[in-house]
């Protein structure tokens, strides 16, 4: 199993392993976000991925928004280079429940990631 757009095409394999997958058309959300961005978040760390990105995932799954998240990182740009980009901006959220069960979710609400090392500012 590979956490990427290509790897997630085999949804049955992921679901058989107990992963909850995005329930929205990610390609359409990505296109809508690029055309009319609504939410850019500065800081791509664990708290963002576990909370804000997951909230947006739930909103997208319910069809309440058409655009996803853009995440920008200026301090720890390696998060973008080593985590986001190799996995097409997907992440995995693992939640340990009070009863000891584990919930595994592939989060796909982040559709674009940028780091300040790749921004070209006008002179």
Model-assigned labels for residue ranges:
Residues 2-10:
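Helix-enriched interaction subdomains in cytosolic or periplasmic regions
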Residues 9-116:
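An N-terminal structural lobe/cap that precedes and organizes the functional/catalytic core
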Residues 117-123:
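Conserved small/polar residues in nucleotide/adenosyl-binding loops
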């Amino acid at each position: 199993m590979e956490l990427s757009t290509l790897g997630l095409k085999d949804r049955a394999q992921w679901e058989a392993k107990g992963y909850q997958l995005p329930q929205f058309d990610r390609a359409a959300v990505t296109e809508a976000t690029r055309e009319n961005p609504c939410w850019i978040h500065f800081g791509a760390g664990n708290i963002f991925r576990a909370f804000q990105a997951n909230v947006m995932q739930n909103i997208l799954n319910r069809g309440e928004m058409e655009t996803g998240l853009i995440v920008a990182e200026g301090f720890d740009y390696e998060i973008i280079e080593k985590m986001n980009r190799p996995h097409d901006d997907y992440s995995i959220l693992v939640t340990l429940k009070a009863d000891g069960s584990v919930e595994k979710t592939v989060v796909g609400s982040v559709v674009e990631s940028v780091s300040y090392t790749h921004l070209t500012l006008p002179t």
